[in-house]
Protein backbone atom coordinates (compact mmCIF):
# COMPACT_ATOMS: atom_id res chain seq x y z
CA UNK A 1 0.00 0.00 0.00
CA UNK A 2 1.28 3.46 -0.89
CA UNK A 3 0.46 6.44 1.34
CA UNK A 4 3.06 9.03 0.27
CA UNK A 5 2.25 11.55 -2.49
CA UNK A 6 5.93 11.40 -3.46
CA UNK A 7 5.36 7.80 -4.62
CA UNK A 8 2.13 8.42 -6.58
CA UNK A 9 3.93 7.77 -9.87
CA UNK A 10 4.19 4.13 -8.75
CA UNK A 11 0.40 4.06 -9.24
CA UNK A 12 0.69 5.37 -12.80
CA UNK A 13 -0.26 8.99 -12.05
CA UNK A 14 2.20 11.51 -13.52
CA UNK A 15 2.31 15.26 -14.21
CA UNK A 16 -0.38 16.29 -16.69
CA UNK A 17 -3.93 15.02 -17.17
CA UNK A 18 -4.24 11.37 -16.20
CA UNK A 19 -7.35 9.75 -17.63
CA UNK A 20 -8.57 7.27 -15.04
CA UNK A 21 -11.86 5.58 -14.26
CA UNK A 22 -13.35 7.01 -11.09
CA UNK A 23 -15.42 4.76 -8.87
CA UNK A 24 -17.91 6.34 -6.50
CA UNK A 25 -21.08 5.37 -4.65
CA UNK A 26 -24.34 7.25 -4.33
CA UNK A 27 -26.22 7.72 -1.05
CA UNK A 28 -27.88 4.29 -1.44
CA UNK A 29 -24.53 2.55 -1.97
CA UNK A 30 -25.07 2.00 -5.71
CA UNK A 31 -21.69 1.91 -7.48
CA UNK A 32 -20.75 4.17 -10.38
CA UNK A 33 -17.74 4.15 -12.70
CA UNK A 34 -16.84 6.85 -15.22
CA UNK A 35 -13.72 8.22 -16.92
CA UNK A 36 -12.35 11.36 -15.30
CA UNK A 37 -9.21 13.46 -15.55
CA UNK A 38 -6.90 13.66 -12.53
CA UNK A 39 -4.58 16.60 -13.09
CA UNK A 40 -1.16 16.51 -11.43
CA UNK A 41 1.06 19.59 -11.42
CA UNK A 42 3.99 18.87 -9.14
CA UNK A 43 2.47 18.23 -5.72
CA UNK A 44 -0.87 19.81 -6.66
CA UNK A 45 -3.73 17.50 -7.64
CA UNK A 46 -7.12 18.47 -9.02
CA UNK A 47 -9.97 16.81 -10.89
CA UNK A 48 -12.13 17.82 -13.80
CA UNK A 49 -15.81 17.50 -12.84
CA UNK A 50 -18.84 18.14 -15.00
CA UNK A 51 -22.15 19.43 -13.62
CA UNK A 52 -24.97 16.96 -13.91
CA UNK A 53 -22.78 13.86 -13.83
CA UNK A 54 -23.33 11.04 -11.33
CA UNK A 55 -19.63 11.15 -10.55
CA UNK A 56 -19.75 14.81 -9.54
CA UNK A 57 -22.90 14.29 -7.46
CA UNK A 58 -21.36 11.29 -5.68
CA UNK A 59 -18.11 13.14 -4.95
CA UNK A 60 -20.12 16.07 -3.60
CA UNK A 61 -21.97 13.72 -1.26
CA UNK A 62 -19.04 11.59 -0.09
CA UNK A 63 -16.05 13.91 -0.50
CA UNK A 64 -13.96 11.14 -2.07
CA UNK A 65 -13.40 8.96 -5.13
CA UNK A 66 -11.14 6.13 -6.21
CA UNK A 67 -9.02 6.57 -9.33
CA UNK A 68 -8.68 3.24 -11.14
CA UNK A 69 -5.74 3.02 -13.55
CA UNK A 70 -6.41 0.86 -16.61
CA UNK A 71 -5.21 0.44 -20.19
CA UNK A 72 -8.33 -1.48 -21.27
CA UNK A 73 -9.98 0.50 -24.10
CA UNK A 74 -13.31 -1.32 -23.73
CA UNK A 75 -13.48 -0.43 -20.03
CA UNK A 76 -13.16 3.27 -20.89
CA UNK A 77 -15.86 2.98 -23.55
CA UNK A 78 -18.29 1.05 -21.33
CA UNK A 79 -17.87 3.38 -18.36
CA UNK A 80 -18.08 6.52 -20.49
CA UNK A 81 -21.59 5.87 -21.82
CA UNK A 82 -22.94 2.88 -19.92
CA UNK A 83 -23.43 1.48 -16.43
CA UNK A 84 -21.26 -1.57 -15.87
CA UNK A 85 -22.52 -4.59 -13.88
CA UNK A 86 -21.94 -4.64 -10.14
CA UNK A 87 -19.71 -7.71 -10.45
CA UNK A 88 -17.10 -5.48 -12.14
CA UNK A 89 -16.61 -3.68 -8.78
CA UNK A 90 -14.64 -5.06 -5.85
CA UNK A 91 -13.84 -3.67 -2.40
CA UNK A 92 -10.16 -3.31 -1.59
CA UNK A 93 -8.93 -1.98 1.74
CA UNK A 94 -12.44 -0.67 2.41
CA UNK A 95 -12.74 1.21 -0.91
CA UNK A 96 -14.80 0.60 -4.05
CA UNK A 97 -12.48 -0.26 -6.95
CA UNK A 98 -12.75 -1.95 -10.34
CA UNK A 99 -11.94 -5.64 -10.51
CA UNK A 100 -9.83 -5.08 -13.67
CA UNK A 101 -7.83 -2.11 -12.38
CA UNK A 102 -4.04 -2.23 -12.68
CA UNK A 103 -3.72 0.19 -9.75
CA UNK A 104 -6.06 2.30 -7.66
CA UNK A 105 -5.72 5.48 -5.60
CA UNK A 106 -8.12 6.99 -3.08
CA UNK A 107 -8.52 10.77 -3.18
CA UNK A 108 -10.41 13.16 -0.92
CA UNK A 109 -12.07 16.31 -2.23
CA UNK A 110 -13.16 18.85 0.34
CA UNK A 111 -16.86 19.72 -0.15
CA UNK A 112 -16.08 23.45 0.06
CA UNK A 113 -14.02 23.11 -3.13
CA UNK A 114 -16.59 21.20 -5.13
CA UNK A 115 -18.53 24.20 -6.40
CA UNK A 116 -15.81 24.78 -9.00
CA UNK A 117 -15.00 22.68 -12.08
CA UNK A 118 -11.43 21.91 -10.97
CA UNK A 119 -11.48 21.17 -7.24
CA UNK A 120 -8.26 20.20 -5.55
CA UNK A 121 -7.86 16.58 -4.55
CA UNK A 122 -5.80 15.05 -1.76
CA UNK A 123 -4.10 11.68 -2.22
CA UNK A 124 -4.87 9.31 0.66
CA UNK A 125 -3.60 5.86 -0.32
CA UNK A 126 -3.27 3.50 -3.25
CA UNK A 127 -2.15 0.10 -4.39
CA UNK A 128 -0.45 -1.37 -7.45
CA UNK A 129 -2.28 -4.54 -8.51
CA UNK A 130 -0.32 -5.53 -11.61
CA UNK A 131 2.81 -4.29 -13.32
CA UNK A 132 2.77 -4.96 -17.02
CA UNK A 133 5.36 -3.43 -19.27
CA UNK A 134 3.93 -2.17 -22.54
CA UNK A 135 4.84 0.12 -25.35
CA UNK A 136 2.59 3.11 -25.96
CA UNK A 137 -0.34 1.95 -28.09
CA UNK A 138 -1.72 4.90 -30.04
CA UNK A 139 -4.96 2.99 -30.56
CA UNK A 140 -5.66 2.68 -26.81
CA UNK A 141 -4.98 6.36 -26.22
CA UNK A 142 -7.21 7.33 -29.13
CA UNK A 143 -10.08 5.14 -27.91
CA UNK A 144 -9.89 6.95 -24.57
CA UNK A 145 -9.94 10.28 -26.43
CA UNK A 146 -12.93 9.11 -28.50
CA UNK A 147 -14.79 8.06 -25.33
CA UNK A 148 -14.26 11.53 -23.87
CA UNK A 149 -15.45 13.14 -27.11
CA UNK A 150 -18.50 10.84 -27.12
CA UNK A 151 -19.59 11.95 -23.65
CA UNK A 152 -19.32 15.56 -24.78
CA UNK A 153 -21.20 14.85 -28.01
CA UNK A 154 -24.04 13.15 -26.14
CA UNK A 155 -24.24 16.05 -23.67
CA UNK A 156 -23.81 18.96 -26.11
CA UNK A 157 -24.76 17.52 -29.53
CA UNK A 158 -21.95 19.49 -31.18
CA UNK A 159 -20.85 18.13 -34.56
CA UNK A 160 -17.26 19.06 -33.69
CA UNK A 161 -17.13 16.09 -31.31
CA UNK A 162 -18.71 13.79 -33.89
CA UNK A 163 -16.11 14.84 -36.47
CA UNK A 164 -13.37 14.19 -33.92
CA UNK A 165 -14.70 10.68 -33.30
CA UNK A 166 -14.78 9.94 -37.07
CA UNK A 167 -11.18 11.19 -37.41
CA UNK A 168 -10.09 9.06 -34.44
CA UNK A 169 -11.85 5.97 -35.85
CA UNK A 170 -9.73 6.17 -39.03
CA UNK A 171 -6.50 6.36 -37.03
CA UNK A 172 -7.55 3.53 -34.69
CA UNK A 173 -8.17 1.43 -37.80
CA UNK A 174 -4.51 1.95 -38.77
CA UNK A 175 -2.82 1.97 -35.35
CA UNK A 176 -5.00 -0.11 -33.07
CA UNK A 177 -5.34 -3.82 -32.62
CA UNK A 178 -8.52 -5.88 -32.57
CA UNK A 179 -9.37 -4.78 -29.00
CA UNK A 180 -9.21 -1.11 -29.93
CA UNK A 181 -11.28 -1.59 -33.09
CA UNK A 182 -13.87 -3.58 -31.12
CA UNK A 183 -13.97 -0.80 -28.50
CA UNK A 184 -14.64 1.81 -31.22
CA UNK A 185 -17.48 -0.34 -32.59
CA UNK A 186 -18.95 -0.57 -29.09
CA UNK A 187 -18.60 3.20 -28.68
CA UNK A 188 -20.71 3.68 -31.82
CA UNK A 189 -23.41 1.37 -30.39
CA UNK A 190 -23.48 3.16 -27.04
CA UNK A 191 -23.61 6.59 -28.68
CA UNK A 192 -26.61 5.52 -30.77
CA UNK A 193 -28.36 4.21 -27.63
CA UNK A 194 -27.62 7.40 -25.71
CA UNK A 195 -28.89 9.60 -28.53
CA UNK A 196 -32.08 7.53 -28.88
CA UNK A 197 -32.83 7.82 -25.13
Question: What are the functions of these language-model segments?
Answer:
Residues 1-104, 108-197:
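Basic, polyanion-binding surface patches
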Amino acid sequence: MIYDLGEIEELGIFDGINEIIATTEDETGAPNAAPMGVIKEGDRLSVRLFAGSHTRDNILAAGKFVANVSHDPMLFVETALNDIPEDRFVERDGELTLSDAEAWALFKCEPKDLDIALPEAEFVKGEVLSREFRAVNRGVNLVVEAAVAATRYVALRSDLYLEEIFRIRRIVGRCGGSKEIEAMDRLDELMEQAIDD
